[in-house]
Protein backbone atom coordinates (compact mmCIF):
# COMPACT_ATOMS: atom_id res chain seq x y z
CA UNK A 1 0.00 0.00 0.00
CA UNK A 2 1.40 3.39 -1.00
CA UNK A 3 0.93 6.23 1.48
CA UNK A 4 -0.09 8.92 0.81
CA UNK A 5 -0.60 9.40 -2.89
CA UNK A 6 -0.34 12.88 -4.36
CA UNK A 7 -3.94 12.76 -5.46
CA UNK A 8 -6.57 10.86 -3.53
CA UNK A 9 -8.71 8.19 -5.06
CA UNK A 10 -11.97 7.58 -3.24
CA UNK A 11 -13.99 4.80 -4.86
CA UNK A 12 -17.56 4.33 -3.63
CA UNK A 13 -19.31 1.00 -4.14
CA UNK A 14 -22.43 -0.74 -2.86
CA UNK A 15 -21.97 -3.92 -0.88
CA UNK A 16 -20.84 -5.30 2.45
CA UNK A 17 -17.80 -3.68 4.05
CA UNK A 18 -16.97 -6.95 5.78
CA UNK A 19 -16.44 -8.62 2.39
CA UNK A 20 -13.28 -6.53 1.91
CA UNK A 21 -10.28 -8.56 0.72
CA UNK A 22 -7.87 -10.33 3.03
CA UNK A 23 -5.36 -7.87 4.48
CA UNK A 24 -7.62 -4.84 4.12
CA UNK A 25 -7.94 -2.29 6.91
CA UNK A 26 -11.55 -1.41 7.73
CA UNK A 27 -11.98 2.21 8.85
CA UNK A 28 -14.85 3.41 11.02
CA UNK A 29 -15.57 6.29 13.38
CA UNK A 30 -15.75 5.61 17.11
CA UNK A 31 -16.67 7.30 20.34
CA UNK A 32 -14.11 7.59 23.13
CA UNK A 33 -16.17 5.73 25.75
CA UNK A 34 -15.40 2.15 24.69
CA UNK A 35 -18.86 1.44 23.27
CA UNK A 36 -19.70 -0.19 19.94
CA UNK A 37 -23.37 -0.52 20.81
CA UNK A 38 -25.36 0.57 17.74
CA UNK A 39 -25.17 1.01 14.00
CA UNK A 40 -22.17 -0.27 12.09
CA UNK A 41 -20.11 -0.20 15.29
CA UNK A 42 -22.35 -2.98 16.65
CA UNK A 43 -21.68 -4.99 13.48
CA UNK A 44 -17.93 -4.49 14.03
CA UNK A 45 -18.31 -5.68 17.64
CA UNK A 46 -20.21 -8.78 16.54
CA UNK A 47 -17.74 -9.70 13.76
CA UNK A 48 -14.51 -8.69 15.52
CA UNK A 49 -14.94 -9.28 19.28
CA UNK A 50 -11.18 -9.56 19.89
CA UNK A 51 -10.59 -6.22 18.15
CA UNK A 52 -13.44 -4.74 20.18
CA UNK A 53 -11.73 -5.86 23.41
CA UNK A 54 -8.56 -3.98 22.35
CA UNK A 55 -10.58 -0.85 21.48
CA UNK A 56 -12.50 -1.00 24.77
CA UNK A 57 -9.32 -1.48 26.82
CA UNK A 58 -7.67 1.46 25.00
CA UNK A 59 -10.63 3.71 25.88
CA UNK A 60 -10.87 2.49 29.48
CA UNK A 61 -7.15 3.10 30.05
CA UNK A 62 -7.49 6.70 28.83
CA UNK A 63 -10.70 7.26 30.81
CA UNK A 64 -9.12 6.02 34.06
CA UNK A 65 -5.82 7.88 33.48
CA UNK A 66 -6.77 10.91 31.37
CA UNK A 67 -4.23 12.45 29.03
CA UNK A 68 -4.71 15.67 27.13
CA UNK A 69 -3.36 17.30 24.00
CA UNK A 70 -3.55 21.01 23.34
CA UNK A 71 -4.84 21.63 19.82
CA UNK A 72 -3.57 24.76 18.05
CA UNK A 73 -6.00 27.57 17.35
CA UNK A 74 -8.16 27.23 14.26
CA UNK A 75 -10.48 29.76 12.70
CA UNK A 76 -14.10 28.68 12.82
CA UNK A 77 -16.42 29.02 9.83
CA UNK A 78 -19.01 30.90 11.91
CA UNK A 79 -16.69 33.63 13.15
CA UNK A 80 -13.36 35.18 12.46
CA UNK A 81 -12.20 34.38 15.97
CA UNK A 82 -9.47 31.81 16.42
CA UNK A 83 -10.03 29.38 19.24
CA UNK A 84 -7.92 26.61 20.67
CA UNK A 85 -9.04 23.67 22.74
CA UNK A 86 -7.69 21.05 25.04
CA UNK A 87 -8.57 17.58 23.82
CA UNK A 88 -8.81 14.53 26.07
CA UNK A 89 -7.30 11.52 24.35
CA UNK A 90 -8.16 9.41 22.44
CA UNK A 91 -10.34 12.09 20.79
CA UNK A 92 -8.85 13.14 17.44
CA UNK A 93 -6.57 10.09 17.19
CA UNK A 94 -6.63 6.73 15.43
CA UNK A 95 -6.20 3.24 16.83
CA UNK A 96 -4.91 0.65 14.35
CA UNK A 97 -5.69 -2.89 15.46
CA UNK A 98 -3.86 -5.69 13.62
CA UNK A 99 -5.83 -8.79 12.58
CA UNK A 100 -6.68 -10.83 15.67
CA UNK A 101 -6.37 -14.60 15.34
CA UNK A 102 -9.74 -15.34 16.94
CA UNK A 103 -11.53 -12.87 14.64
CA UNK A 104 -9.68 -14.04 11.52
CA UNK A 105 -10.49 -17.68 12.21
CA UNK A 106 -14.19 -16.89 12.70
CA UNK A 107 -14.46 -14.63 9.63
CA UNK A 108 -12.10 -16.40 7.23
CA UNK A 109 -10.20 -13.15 6.50
CA UNK A 110 -7.49 -11.17 8.20
CA UNK A 111 -8.80 -7.64 8.54
CA UNK A 112 -7.10 -4.76 10.28
CA UNK A 113 -9.51 -2.48 12.16
CA UNK A 114 -8.91 1.28 12.23
CA UNK A 115 -10.83 3.29 14.81
CA UNK A 116 -11.05 7.02 14.16
CA UNK A 117 -11.95 8.72 17.44
CA UNK A 118 -14.19 11.47 16.08
CA UNK A 119 -16.72 11.98 18.90
CA UNK A 120 -16.10 12.08 22.64
CA UNK A 121 -19.51 10.59 23.40
CA UNK A 122 -22.42 8.84 21.74
CA UNK A 123 -26.21 9.02 21.76
CA UNK A 124 -27.33 12.30 23.29
CA UNK A 125 -23.72 13.07 24.21
CA UNK A 126 -22.40 12.92 20.63
CA UNK A 127 -20.06 15.79 19.76
CA UNK A 128 -21.34 18.63 17.51
CA UNK A 129 -20.77 18.13 13.74
CA UNK A 130 -18.02 20.78 13.47
CA UNK A 131 -16.11 19.14 16.33
CA UNK A 132 -16.53 15.71 14.70
CA UNK A 133 -15.16 17.03 11.39
CA UNK A 134 -12.16 18.64 13.13
CA UNK A 135 -11.54 15.42 15.08
CA UNK A 136 -11.80 13.51 11.79
CA UNK A 137 -9.07 15.70 10.27
CA UNK A 138 -6.82 15.02 13.27
CA UNK A 139 -7.62 11.29 13.38
CA UNK A 140 -7.06 10.77 9.63
CA UNK A 141 -3.71 12.58 9.88
CA UNK A 142 -2.79 10.36 12.85
CA UNK A 143 -3.89 7.23 10.95
CA UNK A 144 -1.81 8.24 7.91
CA UNK A 145 1.24 8.81 10.10
CA UNK A 146 0.83 5.45 11.87
CA UNK A 147 0.32 3.58 8.58
CA UNK A 148 3.50 5.13 7.16
CA UNK A 149 5.41 4.08 10.30
CA UNK A 150 4.02 0.54 10.04
CA UNK A 151 4.98 0.33 6.38
CA UNK A 152 8.50 1.64 7.02
CA UNK A 153 9.16 -0.73 9.91
CA UNK A 154 7.80 -3.94 8.42
CA UNK A 155 9.77 -6.97 7.36
CA UNK A 156 8.63 -8.98 4.35
CA UNK A 157 7.26 -11.78 6.59
CA UNK A 158 5.00 -9.52 8.63
CA UNK A 159 1.37 -8.91 7.83
CA UNK A 160 0.76 -5.52 6.32
CA UNK A 161 -2.19 -3.33 5.46
CA UNK A 162 -2.91 -4.12 1.82
CA UNK A 163 -5.81 -1.72 1.16
CA UNK A 164 -7.97 0.82 2.97
CA UNK A 165 -11.71 0.15 3.04
CA UNK A 166 -14.27 2.26 4.87
CA UNK A 167 -17.91 2.75 5.61
CA UNK A 168 -19.38 6.23 5.23
CA UNK A 169 -18.13 7.03 8.71
CA UNK A 170 -19.68 9.82 10.80
CA UNK A 171 -22.76 9.80 8.52
CA UNK A 172 -24.85 7.40 10.60
CA UNK A 173 -25.43 7.90 14.30
CA UNK A 174 -22.98 10.82 14.49
CA UNK A 175 -25.18 12.74 12.03
CA UNK A 176 -22.48 14.39 9.90
CA UNK A 177 -23.16 14.59 6.14
CA UNK A 178 -20.89 12.06 4.38
CA UNK A 179 -19.52 14.70 2.00
CA UNK A 180 -17.75 16.45 4.89
CA UNK A 181 -15.90 13.28 5.95
CA UNK A 182 -15.19 12.33 2.33
CA UNK A 183 -13.51 15.71 1.85
CA UNK A 184 -11.18 14.92 4.77
CA UNK A 185 -10.13 11.66 3.08
CA UNK A 186 -9.63 13.43 -0.24
CA UNK A 187 -7.54 16.17 1.36
CA UNK A 188 -5.36 13.50 3.02
CA UNK A 189 -4.47 12.07 -0.41
CA UNK A 190 -5.55 8.54 0.47
CA UNK A 191 -6.78 5.71 -1.73
CA UNK A 192 -9.88 4.28 -0.04
CA UNK A 193 -12.73 2.04 -1.14
CA UNK A 194 -15.88 3.29 0.59
CA UNK A 195 -18.70 0.77 0.90
CA UNK A 196 -22.32 1.79 1.35
CA UNK A 197 -25.13 -0.72 1.95
CA UNK A 198 -27.18 -1.88 -1.03
CA UNK A 199 -29.76 0.79 -1.77
CA UNK A 200 -27.93 3.24 0.54
Curated annotation (Swiss-Prot):
InterPro entries recorded: ADP-ribose_metab_enzymes, Macro_dom, Macro_dom-like
Please report any disulfide bonds recorded for this protein chain, giving both cysteine positions.
none
Top-level EC class:
hydrolase
**Macro domain: from which residue to which, for each copy?**
1-200
* Annotated GO MF terms: phosphoprotein phosphatase activity
Any idea which UniProt keywords this protein has? Answer: Hydrolase, Protein phosphatase
Gene3D superfamilies in the cross-refs: Leucine Aminopeptidase, subunit E, domain 1
Summarize where substrate binds, as residue positions. Answer: 15-17, 29-31, 36-41, 169-175
Which GO BP terms apply? peptidyl-glutamate ADP-deribosylation
Catalytic reaction equation(s): ADP-alpha-D-ribose 1''-phosphate + H2O = ADP-D-ribose + phosphate
EC number(s): the record gives 3.1.3.84
Role noted for this protein: Highly specific phosphatase involved in the metabolism of ADP-ribose 1''-phosphate (Appr1p) which is produced as a consequence of tRNA splicing.
What protein family is recorded? Belongs to the POA1 family.
- PANTHER family attached to this UniProt entry: ADP-RIBOSE GLYCOHYDROLASE OARD1, PROTEIN C6ORF130
The protein here is known as ADP-ribose 1''-phosphate phosphatase
Q: From which organism does this entry originate?
A: Neosartorya fischeri (strain ATCC 1020 / DSM 3700 / CBS 544.65 / FGSC A1164 / JCM 1740 / NRRL 181 / WB 181) (Aspergillus fischerianus)
